[in-house]
């Protein structure tokens, strides 16, 4: 019986190390595209427009990782390559101090979900309609409509 104790301890240590290795492997995986719900997608967009940490107060970054995570394939290149835009489309201004943000699912139509977003930016009311799709990796933005324009047309107009 005494001979089994060291062997059992070795087996347990190996088991724990394997579990830890699996866990560490999943934790080190790159960020996947998409989000779990349309509301989560919208919340994560506006998390980049706060007054807090530097990485989350400069607006949604225009890089390929952000583009892959937030946008469908049709918008990814346009978003990542857009530099020097006249204003930030998501806040409809060049600067921001956002009030409370509300979002409501307007309708679900085929593969698209329309999410109405309303907030104030520097005291001015802003309304946008996010058109989001549930892709293989989660929810991503297919387009965003303002009363005067759409994100897709805005990026095409200001292509570098």
Question: Could you say what each language-model-derived stretch is?
Answer:
Residues 68-124:
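Surface-exposed, charged secondary-structure patches
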Residues 128-133:
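Hydrophobic/aromatic beta-strand elements that line small-molecule binding cavities or substrate pockets
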Residues 14-27:
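Bacterial N-terminal signal peptides
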Residues 50-54, 58-80:
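Short, solvent-exposed secondary-structure junction/capping segments
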Residues 36-54:
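Short, aromatic-enriched amphipathic alpha-helices that serve as compact interaction elements
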Residues 29-33:
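Sec/Tat signal peptide C-region and signal peptidase I cleavage site
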Residues 1-13:
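N-terminal secretory signal peptides that target proteins for export/translocation
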Residues 108-112, 116, 122-125, 143-160:
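Low-complexity, intrinsically disordered terminal/linker segments enriched in charged
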